[in-house]
Design a protein with these regions (language model features):
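HKD-type phospholipase D/PLD-like phosphodiesterase module
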Residues: 1-21, 27-175, 186, 191, ...
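Amphipathic alpha-helical interface segments
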Residues: 273-295
């Protein structure tokens, strides 16, 4: 089931944790939500094994903030691993564990939201809650691989939209027949994505936050010269943090931004959605489009 933030709040994540019988495996770019941490603490108290993977060097966060995240997990009795080295930033290396998901063995939440107050109260985000056995197994396989520092293998790449290596699936969503609507925090610098959007022309509509970078503004100007419709959503009262693409046949929701690093180097996770989720995404997009301003 698809959930929209900030309407849903932390409830979809809490559901996964509260319904865990044996284990909770959580991987998120950053974790500071008190309701989520409290739910994890209660899970530990019920005898549930709680494992958490966090990015040790998230962009823009201070060391004390990262230490606070780690201390919170360890204080409740959870087991903490930092992301594998290949998904951690270093001098001259712009790469992150940017995934955002939680699984309990029979159910997973996968989406665009970090687990913090802002995501659940001030951001546009999308979360998908699924009991699809193939998706659950694939996500847990990725978690176990990252927990042990191994490769995830081919099966998760077939079932999920998984980075590194998610560009082909995202391009296929953009290239589907008919119009496409996109919400994203960044326009990004991936040439193939930009060219695919340009090829859509007026059949593509894009909503970005009004705070996009100068480089994003140049890319937006280029896309508009090819006919792409772009609007900017003011940062307040609601910030556009989502990463969503929807057409009439298929949709994407996940952690991936449209940058080469996000698609080809980071750890990212998303899903391809069909059926009723598409209508829900299109309805929310149309409401956001009406609120956004012309560039």
């Amino acid at each position: 089931m698809l959930y929209v933030e900030p309407q849903a709040g932390p409830a979809p994540i809490l559901q996964v944790i509260q319904q865990a019988h044996r284990s909770v495996d959580l991987n998120v770019y950053y974790l500071s939500s008190r309701p989520v941490i409290h739910a994890l603490a209660h899970a530990v108290g019920r005898g549930v094994r709680v494992r958490v993977i966090l990015d040790e060097h998230p962009y823009g966060m201070k060391p004390w903030q990262i230490r606070k995240e780690a201390d919170a997990v360890q204080a409740i009795g959870g087991r903490l691993h930092w992301a594998p080295t290949r998904f951690e930033a270093a001098p001259g290396r712009y790469v992150f564990d940017h995934a955002k998901y939680v699984c309990n063995g029979h159910e997973c939440e996968i989406g665009t939201a970090n687990f913090d107050w802002t995501a659940f109260h001030r951001n546009r985000e999308y979360l998908d809650l699924t009991r699809n056995p193939g998706v659950v197994h694939a996500a847990m396989q990725v978690f176990q691989a990252d927990w042990t520092g191994q490769g995830a293998g081919s099966t998760p790449h077939r079932i999920l939209v998984l980075s590194p290596g998610s560009d082909a699936k995202i391009l296929a969503v953009i290239d589907q027949h008919g119009p496409v609507d996109i919400e994203s925090e960044e326009m990004g610098n991936d040439r193939a994505i930009l060219d695919a959007l340009a090829a859509k022309g007026r059949s593509a509509r894009v909503i970005l936050p009004a705070s996009i970078s100068a480089q994003d503004r140049r890319n937006v100007a280029w896309l508009k010269s090819r006919g792409v419709q772009v609007r900017l959503l003011p940062k307040h009262p609601l910030y556009m943090h989502a990463k969503m693409i929807t057409g009439k046949d298929e949709a994407f929701v996940g952690s991936e931004n449209f940058s080469e690093a996000s698609l080809d180097r980071n750890r990212e996770m998303g899903l391809l959605l069909h059926g009723g989720a598409i209508g829900k995404l299109q309805e929310q997009f149309n409401r956001d489009w009406a609120r956004a301003g012309e560039t």
